[in-house]
Structure formats: structure tokens, C-alpha cells
Amino acid sequence: MYTCSIIIYILTFWQLSKIKKQVAAAEKQVMTVTEKQEAVAEFYDKSTDAWEVFFGEHLHDGFYEPGTTATIPGSKVAVVRMIDELLRFAGISDDPEKKPKTMLDVGCGLGGTCLHVAKKYDIKCTGITISPEQVKCAQDLAATQGLESKVSFDVGDALDMPYKDGTFDLVFTIQCIEHIQDKEKFIREMVRVAAPGAPVVIAGYAARNLSPSEESLKPEEKMVLEKICDHIVLSWLCSTGDYVKWLTPLPVQDIKVWDLTQNITPFYPLCIKEAFTWKSFTSLLKMGGWSAIKVVFAVKMMAMAAEEGLLKFAAVTCRKSK
């Protein structure tokens, strides 16, 4: 275990040292939107089984009290708590007369959010993801838990969702928008399918906001974020300020931002500890191949970037105007 950890740490720092040379090298091949979507679908199709072993049906970060030590049993509670905390921040009511009747989870993964919300809040949930393998897993989980009548899952494009305007009483996404190239269009699409008065919740990773004197991130900061994105098939990372800017001209109100970075960072040491054992490392390699292993490298870089204040985890919520 110790030898494996040392090797992985050396490789991680070696990769970070190569960032500047790689960025300054030949121009990267430009992928079309379709190719990027296919890459994201392939990434999750190949790595879903591997990460499900470690984190269950929730493929997103958990909510921890700052400074706590995360554990595997605790992480399964934390990922569910993250959902509840985001819904609380969005003002979701427990009152049967006021709570949403329907919810859409964009980028639903294995369906964990839909299954939890359907059970706890008695809300009919729909999930959409670009990965056919994830839809199959989500449908199997719903059947196992006896929730087929309360949840449904679709394979679809988040930029062109197959739903009518104003369909859902709550529109939710967590750790999906990072994969999307046209984030402004993604946000417009989420608002489009939200019913009048419906909360819209966007949560995930973001770059730090710029100071008034800055026009862009520093070159070395851009390099680090590009490397992280490359490892986990993210398109690029904008700031929460960008989200607010894109939401402002849309028919929404009550825009709020919540920085949750300190609430997710206890997860990093746990992930690194568990994934960097020889047993876990070889298991990830066997089940998920290089796609799963690259996530391990990314987690270390993400922990460093978050500690330096470059990488943020945040939520932006609003309500569609009536």
C-alpha cells in the first residue's frame, strides 16, 4: 500500500510538472460537439462500474462539516446529505401543498438523486443522461427499490432535451455542467423546461471568480484546470460569476450563490487513500481501465487546486419567474 501510494504521488507531481510543456506544444486537436458528447458517454460507460463499487449510486461529491475526517460509511451518508442541503438552499418546502410535484435531474448518472428525492420527498422524478449504460443501471436500481412508478430515465442531450417548455416543478443538476461546452445554452435549456415559479439548482465545480483588476486567470492556473478537465472529460470550468451573468437576462429571479468548497474537501483524502491502495488501484484498472485511473490522478490535482483557492465547488439557484 505504501509503495503504491508513493508511486502514484510521484506520477501525479510529474504530470503537473509537464503541464506547461504540454500546453506550449503543438495545438490540441479540436473536437466537435458531437465528438465531445460521445467522449463523455464513453467515459461514463467505461468507468461507471468501477466507481459504483466505491461510491454507490451517487456519482457526485458529498457534504461534510468542515474539518471532519471522511470515511467510506460516512461518504454514503454525505452524498445523500449533499442533495438535501442543495434542496434546502433552493427553498424546497416539506409542505405537501407547496413542494414540487415533478423534478428533472439533468446529468442523472446512476439515478441516485432521483431515487432519493422520490423516496424522501415523494416527488415524481425524471433523469436524463447521455450515457446509455447509466440509464440501464438507473433503471435496474429503480426496479430493485420498487420505484419504477416514481422515477424514469432517458438517454438524451442536455442541450436539446426532449421535454416541453415549463414541464417540471424543480430542475436540478449536480456535477454535469462541467462536461458541457456551451454552458450558457445548457442554463437556458434548464430554465426553459422549468415551470413558472420552479426552482432551478446548478451545483458543481467552478473556477475561482476574477478580481476587479483581472481580465482572466493566470496562465499557470489555466494549465492546471485544463489538465484536470482532460483527466475527467470536462469541457472547461467557468466561474459562478459566469453563471450569474448568464442567468440574469433570463426569466428568473432570486439568484443565489453558495460556496461549498470547504464542505467537499474532506472527501479528497478519503478518495486518495482508498484509490491509492494496490487492491483498489488494480480493481479500478480492471473494471474501468485508464478512464477510471485518470480520475485518481485528477483527484490529487483537484485537492491541490482547491487548497490554493483556484478550484471551487458551488451551487447557484434561482426561481423561474411566474
Curated annotation (Swiss-Prot):
Cleaved signal peptide residues: none
Any one GO molecular-function label of the UniProt entry: N-methyltransferase activity
Swiss-Prot/TrEMBL keywords: Alkaloid metabolism, Cytoplasm, Methyltransferase, S-adenosyl-L-methionine, Transferase
Region (SAM motif I) residue spans: 103-112
Compartments reported by the entry: Cytoplasm, Cytosol
Pathway assigned to this chain's UniProt record: Alkaloid biosynthesis; vindoline biosynthesis
A Pfam family recorded for this sequence: Methyltransf_11
GO terms for cellular component: cytosol
Annotated thermal dependence: Optimum temperature is 22 degrees Celsius.
Tissues in which the UniProt entry reports expression: Accumulates in tissues actively synthesizing monoterpenoid indole alkaloids (MIAs) (at protein level). Mainly expressed in young leaves, but barely in roots and stems.
Stated pH dependence: Optimum pH is 7.
Additional record remark: A signal peptide was predicted, but with a low accuracy.
Quaternary organization: Homodimer.
Function: S-adenosyl-L-methionine-dependent N-methyltransferase involved in the biosynthesis of biologically active monoterpenoid indole alkaloids (MIAs) natural products including vindoline. Catalyzes the conversion of picrinine to N-methylpicrinine (ervincine). Also accepts, with low efficiency, 21-hydroxycyclolochnericine and norajmaline as substrates.
Family from the record: Belongs to the class I-like SAM-binding methyltransferase superfamily. gTMT family.
Protein name in the entry: Picrinine-N-methytransferase
Gene: PiNMT
